[in-house]
């Protein structure tokens, strides 16, 4: 059985650029139609090294053509690409603490860096769904469906400079970025 691997499509790059701007080297991103780990569930994507590994049943030729939940999922995975490319140890962080919570609490005074690796993925994908897709029903944290202003306050530093490593999750893993 042939393994499919591809780069991002022009439409995927255009979509991801709405959120990440020039902070990602899009030509480096690979999408694989295979599991990264043998135990990876079918409905799971792993993005440990700047490339996405979807089970063959979830692999699409262009994720912009997917339904809104699939686009949300793709943008969550693009957040891990962004983290990896900025130097965050996504693979190490995922291995050390399997099961990081995806849940997040938006609050004034918080920044994107206050959230863990997985929560950042959902927070950014939820913001994308609200701001650009106008589809609050696909958000993981639907209670923030009317909180675009709060998202933009929390994301102010990221929106001003998505390429800044200061946006990465705080803690030991981020300190490794500076080492």
Please give the residue ranges for each predicted region.
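Metalloprotease/metallohydrolase-associated module, dominated by Zn2+-dependent proteases
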Residues: 6-19, 23-24, 47-49, 85-179
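Active-site recognition of the HExxH zinc-binding catalytic motif
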Residues: 72-84
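Hydrophobic or amphipathic, alpha-helical segments that drive membrane association/targeting
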Residues: 1-43, 58
């Amino acid at each position: 059985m042939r393994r499919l691997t591809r780069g991002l499509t022009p439409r995927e790059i255009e979509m991801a650029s709405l959120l990440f701007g020039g902070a990602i080297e899009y030509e480096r991103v690979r999408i694989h139609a295979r599991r990264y780990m043998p135990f990876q569930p079918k409905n799971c994507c792993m993005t440990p090294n700047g490339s996405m590994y979807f089970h063959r049943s979830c692999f699409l030729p262009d994720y912009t053509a997917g339904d809104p939940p699939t686009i949300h999922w793709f943008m969550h995975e693009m957040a891990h690409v962004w983290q990896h490319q900025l130097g965050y140890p996504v693979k190490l962080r995922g291995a050390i603490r399997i099961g990081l919570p995806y849940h997040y609490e938006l609050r004034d005074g918080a920044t994107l860096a206050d959230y863990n690796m997985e929560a950042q993925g959902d927070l950014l994908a939820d913001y994308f769904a609200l701001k650009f897709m106008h589809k609050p029903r696909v958000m993981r944290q639907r209670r923030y469906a009317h909180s675009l202003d709060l998202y933009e306050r929390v994301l102010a530093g990221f929106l001003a400079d998505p390429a800044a490593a200061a946006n990465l999750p705080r803690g030991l893993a981020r300190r490794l970025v500076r080492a």
